């Protein structure tokens, strides 16, 4: 038997594109006449599935699955919309989303091929979840903080699974995270198993639309279950691979939940690394809040804050006024941005050649 030829990446993308077109054509076969639709209402996007979205009626609280009008592309959890309910359900679809209201904020995630992909809208607070298992990464925390600062979304740092820490280890983690408190960020130590910090977390989430971000395996879904026990069966908890120690991807689509104690929560898919290549270096520099008092004071206007002579930011690091760890992470982020931009350009050129 002849060996089956493996598809190239370009062929795989074309197959997926054709599948999406067929699915979209099938979905568009569900058409609504004007006389089959009720009056326009305000709604809240709970989650989205392709050309469908689950919309909460802001008057009744009921959730209906709706089609999207042509031209509505970037609908995401947290969006406020205008929608019309069908007088009867058609193939499980109960209405149509007709317009998206202006957003106060938009969280996006870079994609190599498609540029920026929206993740969630109208976010008030970014809950950056880390964990003692698989391991705490201050570099990942700093990446999320850059995203939060550039989007003007208030960040909240949460260290999960602290029940696994011995006393000496806990003191070490507290020392690591004390720097973030020093520069003005709120830090919480929490555990679903012991209940530590859960009530404090509930207080911080009230009256806000919150999004949980963090690597896979840090326990975002387990915290959702701790905040809303009735969803224990609905939200699948991630397992840690015994072989690699890495978390398995669990949540497959961003979804908004109402927290019984107040506030809303959007649970988003975990990511291994939060891409920042779409930002300019100056934006990243300003996103490190403790750098701001020193910016503009270096000897040279184009100072890279590395080995440049007369760099007052590096002098501040040497004096202990700025964290050396944060300063090193800053340069790592800039280096990875340059690498990712180069890889993206290579991918785009390769895609154009296919």
From Swiss-Prot:
Keywords: Cytoplasm, GTP-binding, Hydrolase, Metal-binding, Nucleotide-binding, Ribosome biogenesis, RNA-binding, rRNA-binding, Zinc
GO CC annotations, alphabetized: cytoplasm
Pfam families in the cross-refs: RsgA_GTPase
Region spans: Disordered: 1-28
Gene3D superfamilies: Nucleic acid-binding proteins, P-loop containing nucleotide triphosphate hydrolases, Probable gtpase engc, domain 3
Keyword Zinc: yes
Cofactor: Zn(2+)
Domain CP-type G as annotated: residue spans: 113-274
GO biological process terms held by the UniProt record: ribosomal small subunit biogenesis
Family: Belongs to the TRAFAC class YlqF/YawG GTPase family. RsgA subfamily.
Reported function: One of several proteins that assist in the late maturation steps of the functional core of the 30S ribosomal subunit. Helps release RbfA from mature subunits. May play a role in the assembly of ribosomal proteins into the subunit. Circularly permuted GTPase that catalyzes slow GTP hydrolysis, GTPase activity is stimulated by the 30S ribosomal subunit.
Name recorded for this polypeptide: Small ribosomal subunit biogenesis GTPase RsgA 1
Species whose genome carries this gene: Vibrio parahaemolyticus serotype O3:K6 (strain RIMD 2210633)
């Amino acid at each position: 038997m002849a060996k089956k030829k493996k598809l190239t990446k370009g062929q795989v993308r074309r197959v997926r594109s054709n599948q999406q077109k067929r699915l979209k054509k099938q979905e568009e076969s569900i058409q609504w006449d004007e006389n089959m639709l009720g009056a326009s209402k305000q709604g809240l996007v709970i989650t989205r599935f392709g050309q469908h979205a689950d919309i909460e009626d802001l008057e009744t609280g009921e959730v209906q699955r709706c089609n999207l009008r042509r031209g509505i592309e970037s609908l995401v959890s947290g969006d406020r919309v205008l929608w019309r309910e069908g007088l009867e359900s058609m193939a499980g679809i109960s209405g149509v989303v007709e317009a998206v209201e202006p957003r106060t904020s938009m969280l996006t995630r870079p994609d190599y091929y498609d540029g920026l992909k929206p993740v969630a809208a109208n976010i008030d607070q970014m809950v950056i979840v880390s964990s003692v298992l698989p391991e705490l990464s201050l570099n990942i925390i700093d990446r999320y903080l850059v995203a939060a600062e550039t989007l003007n979304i208030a960040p909240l740092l949460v260290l999960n699974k602290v029940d696994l820490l011995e006393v000496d280890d806990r003191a070490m983690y507290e020392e690591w995270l004390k720097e973030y408190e020093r520069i003005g960020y709120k830090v919480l130590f929490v555990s679903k198993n012991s209940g530590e910090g859960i009530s404090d977390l509930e207080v911080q989430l009230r009256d806000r639309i919150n999004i949980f971000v963090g690597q896979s395996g840090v326990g975002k879904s387990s915290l959702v279950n701790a905040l809303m026990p009735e969803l224990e069966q609905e939200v699948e908890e991630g397992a840690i691979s015994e072989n690699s120690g890495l978390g398995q991807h669990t949540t497959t689509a961003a979804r908004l939940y109402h927290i019984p104690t107040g506030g809303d929560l959007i649970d988003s898919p975990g990511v291994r690394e939060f891409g920042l290549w779409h930002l300019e270096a100056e934006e990243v520099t300003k996103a490190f809040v403790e750098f701001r008092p020193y910016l503009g004071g270096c000897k040279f206007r184009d100072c890279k804050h590395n080995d440049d002579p007369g760099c007052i930011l590096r002098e501040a690091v040497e004096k202990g006024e700025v964290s050396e760890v944060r300063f090193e992470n800053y340069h790592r982020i800039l280096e990875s941005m340059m690498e990712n931009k180069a890889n993206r350009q290579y991918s785009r050129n390769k895609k154009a050649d296919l």
